[in-house]
């Protein structure tokens, strides 16, 4: 809902500046998606016309009495930290000739949505809102996925978080290019896996990772784990027992009192929730 965007603290704080600048500025990516799904989000990314990013971010920092941070001087990405040092907004130059071109370079249609802050309208050039409504994760193009293979794993992370289905073509792409994850930085893979494990639909997602032959590219040891039969205490082989452990943790969480839920929703080291780490710890104990 557009009202969710306007009601956000960060958006309300910068709107007077945006309107006074009289230049198009677009919120892009996950923030727009999450607002349309009625989910809380504080990850605000803004795109401005090519070449305007540095000046725009500098002026916004001055307006907010905040701080200007240069994140990437090659790709012209900047961060404006609010004076409270808790909130921030990232600002980048448009990567295409227009915002429409920029959006077409993104990974999935549900992430290729922009909100024009100046005109207060949503820009959707790849039918992302339809896919959002229908719960579909759809590729914009195969090239966009292969251009940065971590997007293969991002697809599964979004499935875990939202419970969406993959488009038929995306399933083919994910399976076809799974091998490219073998050369992707382990640090990037770890970030996505931790987020995936923290999703409400983690078990179904891992099952799909396995079905599309992506899991064994991420964790080669899984091939041997599947060969370990159940012992006298269990009725499932080690692989499916691990999945069942995760499923039971979720059931425990869903049926817990509010106080317990709040405890597991708290973030600990790495910015991840305790619930995510509990699933990992229990899985490791069962595999030892």
Where do the language-model regions lie?
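Catalytic cores of the polymerase beta-like nucleotidyltransferase superfamily
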Residues: 1-288
